[in-house]
Each structure stands twice: as C-alpha cells, then as structure tokens.
C-alpha cells in the first residue's frame, strides 16, 4: 500500500517510499549544507559588524547579503529539508504560504544585492575620484532597502494573493494541490514574471556592468604599460597596488556572481519552461534544483575565505577568542595606503 501524507487518502499527497537509509543520508547531507551556510554567513556578519576597518559601503552591502543568506539557512532550509526528504508538508497550509513567500523573497534578494554590489564596484574601479561622493551611506541604505523591500512585496504579494497559479487554477487544483503537500507552482504568466524579476533583469544588469568594468580595467592596464616608466615609476607603484586591490575585489565579486548564476540558472530556466511543457518536470527534480540554488548561499562565504585575507584573519581571531579583547574592533585586518 502506498504511504500517504494525510489520513484522508483521497485528498492526500503521496509520501515517498524511500528506505530509512536513503532518508538518513539525505537528512545528513542537508543538515551539513544548512550548518555550513549558517556558520559561514554568520562569520561574515560578525566580522563586518565588529571590525571598524570593514565599515565600508561595499562591505555593508556584503553584510546585508550575508544576512539574506543566513536567514535562508535559518528560516527556509530546515523546512525545505523535511519536505524534500519526506515529500510531505507537516506544518499547515498557512505556514506553507509563509515559507514559500520567504523562500522566493530571500532567493530574489540575493541577486538584487549582487546587482547593487556590481554597480558599487563599477564606480570604485571606473570612477574612483567620485566614488565616495556617489556611493555615500544614503545611497547604500537605499540600495539595501530596495534589495529587501521589492523581493518581499513581490513574493508575499504573489503567494498570498494566489497570483502564482492564476490562469492555471484548473491544472493546479486537479493535478497538483493535495493535503500534506507544499509544492511551488507557477502558471505561464507568473513563471515568466518570476524569471524576469528575480533572475533575468538583475542578472543582465550584473553581466553588463561587469563586462563594462572588464573593458575599462583592460584599457587602464594598457595605458599604464605604455606610460613612461622613468617618469611615473613612483606613481605606478602606488596606483599599481591600489588597482591590483580593486581588480582582485572585482574578480572576487565576479566569482560570487558566477556562482549565483550557475546555482540558480537551472531552477529559473525550469520555472519559466515547465508551464509551457505542460508540467513534465517531476517534483523530485524540482527539489534537487531548489537545493542546488540554496548552495549559492553556502558558497558565498567560501569565496570570501579564499579571496579576502581580511576574512581569514577575522576568522582566526574569532576561533582564538581575540574579538573579546579590549579594542579588538580597531584591529587592522589589512594594510591601508595613505593618500
């Protein structure tokens, strides 16, 4: 007999019949992903909050993005873990809507942050003289506000007003909806709208901005190499270090963006294509793609650990308890060049 999620069989979702060993393996893997996500992003949050040297416009955007990733690991992933391993939802229909809305909101907020970080890097690298004037604290606050508010309004509005299956109500209630389930369902219109809002438009902005940065950085490198070394050797040494630092930051943020696109691209492509293919994508594959997307929030702190020396030094100070020492917040995590 098939296992069911609800005691009223004719309206219940079907529970998976995986063995206990398979379930235990899945739970172990997903718990590892969740813990890695929480610990990694918490280190980023604490580092930027604690050390005054890290209180820069770019780092506040990174801090906000790490908060998004931390909340995804804290509020979304644990419930998704149970749903994925059991193929059942035990937390009620209202909380299903809250969970789905929060999931869409935080996933969308990540790429919004990355878009604004790319714009910040554009001015830092391509217009450094006016960077501090253009990317002041007010501008950063507006960017952070938009990164949180727009995804929140979009996600909660769409799910609680049930706009996500508008135009496909018959398919949803006849073939998808059942007691004990919490699947993410999109109609043709809502699928395209989600793809455009959460992925394509902000992702395209990022790609265009980083390509522009690449062209300008390449041109700057050519001009420096053509300059008279005897007359400008001192200037080159100072600017070379500064530009090397900026190029490294751009490279790091570019990798962060690339990881996001690689992780979320399969899910968003399936989201926009599935309604046009008459919903042929099985729920298990959809779960796999969702978790593959979640991995983006796990990988971001790892990118910082590999490419940012300040992250490694901050981590070392935390592990040895040095952040509890007096004036540890004023510790120099990296060398600052005087102007």
Swiss-Prot record:
Activity regulation, free text: Activated by SEP-363856 small molecule: IHCH-7179 acts both as an agonist activator for HTR1A and TAAR1.
Q: GO CC terms for this protein?
A: endomembrane system; endoplasmic reticulum membrane; plasma membrane
> Quick one: effect of changing residue 268 to A?
Abolished activation of G alpha proteins in response to 3-iodothyronamine-binding
Q: In which tissues is it expressed?
A: Expressed at low level in both the central and peripheral nervous system. Moderately expressed in stomach. Low levels in amygdala, kidney, and lung, and small intestine. Trace amounts in cerebellum, dorsal root ganglia, hippocampus, hypothalamus, liver, medulla, pancreas, pituitary, pontine reticular formation, prostate, skeletal muscle and spleen.
Name the consequence of residue 290 to A: Reduced activation of G(i) G alpha proteins in response to agonist-binding. Does not affect activation of G(s) G alpha proteins in response to agonist-binding
| UniProt topological domain (Extracellular) ranges | 1-24, 82-96, 162-188, 274-286
**Family as reported in the entry's similarity comment:** Belongs to the G-protein coupled receptor 1 family.
Q: Which protein are we looking at?
A: Trace amine-associated receptor 1
Gene coding for it = TAAR1
């Amino acid at each position: 007999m098939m296992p069911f999620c609800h005691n009223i069989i004719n309206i219940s979702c079907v529970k998976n019949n995986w063995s206990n060993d398979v379930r235990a393996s899945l739970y172990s893997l997903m718990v590892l992903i969740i813990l890695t996500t929480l610990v990694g992003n918490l280190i980023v949050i604490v580092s930027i909050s604690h050390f005054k040297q890290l209180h820069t416009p770019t780092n506040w955007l990174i801090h906000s993005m790490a908060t998004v990733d931390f909340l995804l690991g804290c509020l979304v992933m644990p419930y998704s873990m149970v749903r994925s391993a059991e193929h059942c939802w035990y937390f009620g229909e209202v909380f299903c809507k809250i969970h789905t809305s929060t999931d869409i909101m935080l996933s969308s907020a990540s790429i919004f942050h990355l878009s604004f970080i790319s714009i910040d890097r554009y001015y830092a690298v391509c217009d450094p003289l006016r960077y501090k004037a253009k990317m002041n604290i007010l501008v950063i606050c507006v960017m952070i506000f938009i990164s949180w508010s727009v995804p929140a309004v979009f996600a909660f509005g769409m799910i609680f007003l049930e706009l996500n299956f508008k135009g496909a109500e018959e398919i949803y209630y006849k073939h998808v909806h059942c007691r004990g389930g919490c699947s993410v369902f999109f109609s043709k219109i809502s699928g395209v709208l989600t793809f455009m809002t959460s992925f394509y438009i902000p992702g395209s902005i990022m790609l265009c901005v980083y390509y522009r940065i690449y062209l300008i950085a390449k041109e700057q490198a050519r001009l420096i190499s053509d300059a008279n070394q005897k007359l400008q050797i001192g200037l080159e040494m100072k600017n070379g270090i500064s530009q090397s630092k900026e190029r490294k930051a751009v490279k790091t943020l570019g990798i962060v963006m690339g990881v996001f696109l690689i992780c979320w691209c399969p899910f968003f492509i399936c989201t926009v294509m599935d309604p046009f293919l008459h919903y042929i994508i099985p729920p298990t594959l959809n779960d796999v793609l969702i978790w593959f997307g979640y991995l983006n929030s796990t990988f971001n702190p790892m990118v910082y650990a590999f490419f940012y020396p300040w992250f490694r030094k901050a981590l070392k100070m935390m592990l040895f308890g040095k952040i509890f020492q007096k004036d540890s917040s004023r510790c120099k995590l990296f060398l600052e060049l005087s102007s």
